[in-house]
Amino acid sequence: GLEPQPVSLTVTLPLSEYYDGDCQRNEENIRRKRENLMRELVLNKGRAFTVTDVKVMPESLPAAFSRLAELKPGPAETTLIIDLGGTTLDAGVIVGQFDDISAVHGNPSVGVSQVTRAAAGALRAADSETSALIADTVIRNRNDRQYLQRVINDAGKIDEVRNKITEAITSLGARVTSELTAFRNVNRVFLVGGGASLIEEAIRQAWPLAPDRIEVIGDPQMALAREIALYNKED
């Protein structure tokens, strides 16, 4: 592994913590985050990494860096970023090509975990493995009947498992679109995070935009980390 040495860190804060009610940087929250990570660490009989610098960035929004650079939206155009993770929903509106942030929204109780729980419950009823890993894999492969026949022990309940997952996905999509009704007038929508593909259909139905104006960012679960790494490399 990597030997203990001086390191600089890039970390993130949820949008509702990074920005204040006026969509300005919340310098107090950012300062606390930096100070917390720059505290000296002492290990008993061991060497520790020394944090020399901490850069704090907002979650979600940086995932759109590369795509907005390709599209080059005008200063009057707005882009809604919807970031759906396991337990949280973050969203923000970018003006132009990161000229400004006009709105942010966060809800720490909306996430893919509600679909995972539904899948695990259905798998349990089908006498099958119910770990989060298996449940998430079943969700991703819910339309692959051959795969489901291999992992669901009670084959007679395969359709019931699929129906429970579909119901949970529909419910999640409805909750996300309800949370974000105030942002229907944007010019485009980008979806990121592990739940992006699950809510894509619901977003397309709820936003009155041309199909090419709504996108799931490539490899959405890794998009934020990838774009932050690219940003730091160029910085």
Question: Model-predicted segments: where are they?
Answer:
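Nucleotide/phosphate-binding catalytic cleft detector across ATP-hydrolyzing
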Residues: 1-81, 98-112, 142-189, 193-235
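Short helix/loop capping segments that flank catalytic or ligand/cofactor-binding pockets
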Residues: 65-66, 90-92
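Glycine-rich phosphate-binding loop plus the immediately following alpha-helix
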Residues: 92-132
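Conserved, helical-rich catalytic subdomain that frames metal- and/or nucleotide-binding sites
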Residues: 126-148
